């Protein structure tokens, strides 16, 4: 009973901190050149499903114009929820929070602007042990990501993409098996 109350109190504090961080960052994001809200869903090995809510900031930095395409950088902040459907799950509900700078190679103009992207960010997890036989070692994780997608619409307000994400603690602590997510995401840009 005491352990359950402690978990509930920790979860409540985690959610309050995430809401406060989003509220505190809102003015900075709102004054940016362009920002967006992203929702994603994904699946991973070890019977884990992931729901993700993100905020993206595009400072409109461009360089290396090549054949109608150019490079750009986008900053993203994420809060995610993992759900393990494994019967042996010790912590079936895990929260993740983190940031990722993303480099894109994107079409420079058009109603539909395809891109490829890659990024390396950091994440913090609420729990490190998912089942008795699977643990990610530490709450601190690196998040490597590659993906494809497109920005579209008359005002370039919409974005959709597919990403492959690998989380690992980079050998900081054992065990370090890593975990791989395949994710679909949608974004609305303001």
Residue ranges and their predicted role:
Residues 37-43, 75-81, 116-122, 162-166:
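Transmembrane beta-barrel strands of outer-membrane/channel proteins
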Residues 42-51, 88, 110, 171-177:
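Solvent-exposed loop/turn segments connecting transmembrane beta-strands
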Residues 48-50, 96, 141-143, 179-181:
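Membrane-spanning beta-strands of outer-membrane beta-barrel proteins
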Residues 29-34, 60-71, 106-114, 154-157:
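Short loop/turn motifs that connect adjacent beta-strands in outer-membrane beta-barrel proteins
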Residues 40-41, 86-90, 130-136, 169-174:
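Extracellular loop and loop/strand-boundary signature of outer-membrane beta-barrel proteins
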Residues 1-32:
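Cleavable N-terminal export/targeting peptides
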Residues 51-55, 178-190:
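Outer-membrane beta-barrel "beta-signal"
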Residues 41-43, 57-59, 105-107, 150-152, ...:
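Residue-level signature of outer-membrane beta-barrel architecture
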């Amino acid at each position: 009973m005491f352990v359950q109350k402690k978990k509930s109190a920790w979860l409540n504090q985690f959610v309050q901190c995430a809401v406060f961080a989003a509220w505190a960052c809102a003015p900075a994001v709102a004054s940016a050149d362009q920002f967006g809200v992203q929702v994603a869903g994904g699946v991973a090995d070890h019977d884990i499903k992931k729901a993700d809510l993100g905020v993206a900031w595009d400072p409109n930095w461009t360089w290396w114009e090549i054949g109608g395409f150019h490079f750009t950088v986008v900053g993203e902040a994420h809060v995610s929820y993992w759900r393990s459907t494994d019967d042996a799950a010790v912590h079936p509900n895990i929260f993740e929070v983190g940031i990722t700078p993303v480099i894109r190679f994107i079409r420079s103009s058009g109603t539909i602007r395809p891109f490829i992207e890659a990024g390396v960010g950091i994440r913090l997890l609420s729990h490190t042990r998912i089942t008795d036989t699977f643990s990610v070692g530490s709450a601190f994780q690196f998040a490597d990501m590659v993906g494809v997608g497109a920005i579209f619409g008359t005002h370039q307000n919409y974005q959709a993409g597919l990403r492959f994400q690998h989380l690992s603690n980079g050998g900081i602590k054992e065990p370090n098996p890593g975990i791989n997510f395949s994710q679909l995401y949608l974004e609305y840009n303001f």
